[in-house]
């Protein structure tokens, strides 16, 4: 992509919400410039890739801190809230419906990957080196 900024927040909020609950695979590129909190739940598993900034997420009753070059996995139907602590917070979101994943034979045995991790497991996805993180982002852009 030549100019990523043209894709930043380029979605309708209502369509975005519908996609989170109904599309097999959905990719978003968003940036928030205020630390405003938000609480929500959706059917899809959510993988967040933080490009810049950071925040605190509460998933079920567990707290998670995420910052630049970090990845956070949120299981489908897990209520979660977020508050940005470093703005702007620029992130990629990849959401996948669990039923779609379960329909793929090669993925079915790996379904635990798409559930919310414990805070200890989530720490393993923090501070990913630039080369690896950028490769993950380039894969998302191909979806």
PLM region descriptions:
Residues 35-42, 59, 82-85, 105:
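Short histidine-centered beta-strand/loop micro-motifs
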Residues 25-42, 51, 79:
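Conserved short histidine dyad/triad with adjacent acidic residue
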Residues 33-34, 68-69, 77, 97-99:
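Tight coil/turn sites that cap or link beta-strands
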Residues 44, 68, 88-90:
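A structure-centric signal for secondary-structure junctions around beta-strands
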Residues 1-26, 79-143:
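A hydrophobic/aromatic-rich effector-binding and dimerization subdomain
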Residues 61-75:
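Short acidic-glycine-tyrosine-enriched beta hairpin
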Residues 16-20, 37-41, 49, 63-64:
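Short secondary-structure boundary/capping segments within folded domains
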Residues 40-57, 73:
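Short, conserved beta-strand element in jelly-roll/cupin
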């Amino acid at each position: 992509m030549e100019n990523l900024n043209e894709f930043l927040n380029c979605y309708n909020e209502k369509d975005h919400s519908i996609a989170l609950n109904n599309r097999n695979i959905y990719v978003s590129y968003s940036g928030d410039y205020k630390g405003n909190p938000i609480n929500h739940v959706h059917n899809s598993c959510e993988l967040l890739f933080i490009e810049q900034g950071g925040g605190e997420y509460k998933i079920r009753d567990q707290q998670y801190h995420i910052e630049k070059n970090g990845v956070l996995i949120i299981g489908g139907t897990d209520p979660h809230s977020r508050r940005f602590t470093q703005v702007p917070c620029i992130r990629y979101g990849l959401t996948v419906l669990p039923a779609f994943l379960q329909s793929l034979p090669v993925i079915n045995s790996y379904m635990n990957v798409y559930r919310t991790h414990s805070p200890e497991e989530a720490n393993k996805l923090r501070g990913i080196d630039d080369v690896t993180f950028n490769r993950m982002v380039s894969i998302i852009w191909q979806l």
